[in-house]
């Protein structure tokens, strides 16, 4: 139905007035504005990139990665930093926990020489630094580790045992209100690492778990990823890593509730080669005969770990199989589930 001519004139006049006050583009007709594709930063995990629906975490948005201790939250965040840097991005790490392992970050592929790092004393200081570097327009990705460690100044200055109810939640709510629009305008991705707490007095239905920092982050985050350790990886009775499951519990840019599983190897991080084998076998791109794994006419190795070692050495072959996996799954199809049974002994 056509819009009344008088209404069109009135709204056009209003748009001109708004442009004068707030700048051109403050109010636009959606039909006049080209819809831009959402850019993404790879997570370093083939399965998680597929689960997120756009090939990684979206740029210009707030992301929350949460889970129990030692589940792989920081490892995943460092992989995202490494992938961003590979494409020329500038990254910052706000280490509120004062626990960043620089040597481990380097082993995951992070360019530590060019990584901006801050170890703030208070939550207010951390969030002020975050706002300043975001408004500069020169940063592509900021990781805050973690929300639980963003301690309000009043709590630090107070005595042990003092009650500071809701201080951190108010701090987070205020910061997110200020920073969300700036992140979108500057196309900066912000990742909050968060911890899990048990709800006090929780009875009956519903999950007894919750995340720290109040409810604001749950609302402002475009993507929330729940990561858990589900098994230990062993080789010759030695623990060599963990199996992790990541579930996209909220996603504003693609369908939510998709899951991905991947190996996190001690000292190495996410095993891309392990995912290539898992998805390759599931999609019949990699052949599995007994313990032997092969691709076309080439033997990859006897056992999953040997095949992973070969793919780690032969990057060209790994890239070739990865491309075939992506083509097989397709960008518009549902994520393929991982094999029901692990290819290597886990506990």
UniProtKB/Swiss-Prot annotation:
Keywords: ATP-binding, Cytoplasm, DNA damage, DNA recombination, DNA repair, DNA-binding, Nucleotide-binding, SOS response. It comes from the Bacteria. Belongs to the RecA family. PANTHER family: MITOCHONDRIAL DNA REPAIR PROTEIN RECA HOMOLOG-RELATED, RECA. The keyword Ribosomal protein does not apply. ATP binds at residues 67-74. It is found in: Cytoplasm. Its main location: cytoplasm. One of its GO terms (biological process) is SOS response. GO terms for molecular function: ATP binding; ATP hydrolysis activity; ATP-dependent DNA damage sensor activity; damaged DNA binding; single-stranded DNA binding. Disulfide bonds: none annotated. This is Protein RecA. SUPFAM superfamilies: P-loop containing nucleoside triphosphate hydrolases (SSF52540), RecA protein, C-terminal domain (SSF54752). GO terms for cellular component: cytosol. The gene is recA. SMART domains: AAA (SM00382). Pfam families: RecA, RecA_C. Can catalyze the hydrolysis of ATP in the presence of single-stranded DNA, the ATP-dependent uptake of single-stranded DNA by duplex DNA, and the ATP-dependent hybridization of homologous single-stranded DNAs. It interacts with LexA causing its activation and leading to its autocatalytic cleavage. The keyword Iron-sulfur does not apply.
